């Protein structure tokens, strides 16, 4: 299992998001800055108010491999490495200027320990992490790049306005030229269906 943690709005984590916004430090993040770097022992969690991030690592040939994208109203953290006292394996890097609310995970410990539903929130974290990692594994192993492209388009309709083609290509597992051909093909298909 990878070490990046992406908590989406699919699960009911609204109370936790509100808590992070209340007690977290509001930070302006510039394009290219890292929220976390591979090798760090982190222990941070953040709510994304504005902007987009990528979980990325370079392979042995120096090519960027993108594991995930995160956008507004999502949480990012290094919960699993932190709990296991392990270094982070991926960079979480801003793809555009943004605003996050960030707090050390340790600052939320009292909430988890005193809140009646605190254990439920931790369980939801872990379940959400596990399910998202499984989704990504299944996607990479079982889906074609075209299917991954369609799923990404559905999740983030404005992805091509926010993320460069090279990063999208790395995420779906193709070269940028192949992505351009795929995109052109899908656009032609859409225009043919709409006429």
Residue ranges and their predicted role:
Residues 143-195:
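Phosphate-/nucleic-acid-contacting segments
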Residues 1-30, 81:
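Cyclic nucleotide-binding regulatory module and flanking cytosolic helices
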Residues 25, 34, 52-57, 75, ...:
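Short beta-strand segments in beta-sandwich/barrel cores
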Residues 35-40:
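Short phosphate-coordinating micro-motif centered on Lys-Gly-acidic
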Residues 66-123:
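Cyclic-nucleotide recognition modules
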Residues 129-139:
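Short, Lys/Arg-enriched N-terminal segment that forms or immediately precedes the first helix
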Residues 59-65:
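Hydrophobic/aromatic-rich structural module bridging two neighboring secondary-structure elements via a short loop
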Residues 32, 43-54, 72-73:
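Glycine- and acidic-residue-biased ligand/ion/polar-headgroup-sensing regions
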């Amino acid at each position: 299992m990878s070490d990046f943690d992406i908590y989406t709005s699919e699960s009911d984590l609204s109370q936790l998001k509100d808590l992070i916004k209340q007690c977290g430090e509001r930070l302006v993040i510039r394009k290219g800055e890292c929220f976390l770097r591979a090798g760090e022992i982190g222990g941070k969690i953040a709510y994304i108010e504005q902007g987009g991030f990528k979980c990325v690592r370079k392979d042995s040939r120096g090519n960027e491999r993108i594991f995930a994208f995160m956008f507004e109203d999502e949480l990012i953290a290094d919960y699993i490495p932190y709990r296991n006292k392990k270094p982070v394996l991926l960079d979480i890097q801003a793809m555009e200027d943004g605003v996050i609310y960030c707090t050390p995970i340790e600052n939320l410990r009292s909430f988890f320990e005193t809140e009646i539903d605190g254990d439920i929130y931790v369980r939801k974290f872990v379940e959400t992490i596990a399910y998202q990692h499984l989704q990504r594994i299944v996607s990479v192993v079982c889906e074609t790049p075209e299917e991954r492209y369609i799923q990404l388009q559905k999740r983030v309709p404005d992805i091509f306005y926010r993320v460069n083609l090279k990063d999208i290509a790395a995420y779906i597992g193709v070269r940028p030229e192949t992505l351009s051909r795929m995109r052109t093909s899908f656009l032609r298909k859409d225009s043919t269906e709409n006429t």
